[in-house]
């Protein structure tokens, strides 16, 4: 099935790309969610409009991402208070939502929880940590925080 993407789809493409996908993937996921439209000659005109809008959005996003990166790197005192055992192990682990809330509480910028990249070994003990926040393609900021016992 030949489709035109209307939004960025991970491992497939960005808005405006013409892609060939299996029929079930197109009919059951991409089309119902509005992530793609069926490729027709008339739809190619829509591609031009989507690409123009995307270029303008990328310029705005790039400037905004640079501002957010500077704010995150200047941010200090981000702490996350969680319940722990006597040995310092957490009951559960620190999640991206917790990091976003802590950054916001410390006076930092609003982040999307999907931008935070947690390490393979999840945060399960108290201490100081550093994670990456992927703001846009090519702009990655480091977020430093400390996990303390509540």
Swiss-Prot record:
Keywords: Ribonucleoprotein, Ribosomal protein, RNA-binding, rRNA-binding. GO terms for molecular function: rRNA binding; structural constituent of ribosome. PROSITE patterns: RIBOSOMAL_L9. Gene3D superfamilies: Ribosomal protein L9, C-terminal domain, Ribosomal protein L9, N-terminal domain. GO terms for biological process: translation. GO terms for cellular component: ribonucleoprotein complex; ribosome. SUPFAM superfamilies: L9 N-domain-like, Ribosomal protein L9 C-domain. It holds the Pfam family Ribosomal_L9_N. Binds to the 23S rRNA. Belongs to the bacterial ribosomal protein bL9 family. This is Large ribosomal subunit protein bL9. It comes from Corynebacterium glutamicum (strain R). The lineage of its organism: Bacteria, Bacillati, Actinomycetota, Actinomycetes, Mycobacteriales. The gene is rplI.
């Amino acid at each position: 099935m030949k489709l035109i993407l209307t939004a960025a789809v991970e491992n497939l493409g960005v808005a405006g790309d013409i892609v060939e996908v299996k029929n079930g993937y197109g009919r059951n996921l991409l089309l119902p969610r509005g992530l793609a439209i069926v490729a027709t000659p008339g739809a190619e005109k829509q591609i031009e409009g989507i690409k123009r809008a995307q270029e303008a959005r990328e310029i705005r996003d790039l400037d905004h991402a640079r501002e957010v990166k500077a704010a995150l790197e200047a941010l200090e005192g981000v702490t996350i208070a969680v319940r722990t055992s006597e040995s310092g192990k957490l009951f559960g682990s620190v999640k991206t939502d917790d990091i976003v809330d802590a950054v916001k509480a410390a006076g930092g910028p609003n982040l999307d929880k999907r931008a935070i990249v947690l390490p393979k070994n999840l945060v399960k003990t108290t201490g100081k940590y550093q994670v990456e926040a992927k703001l846009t393609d090519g702009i990655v900021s480091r977020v430093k925080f400390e996990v303390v016992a509540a």
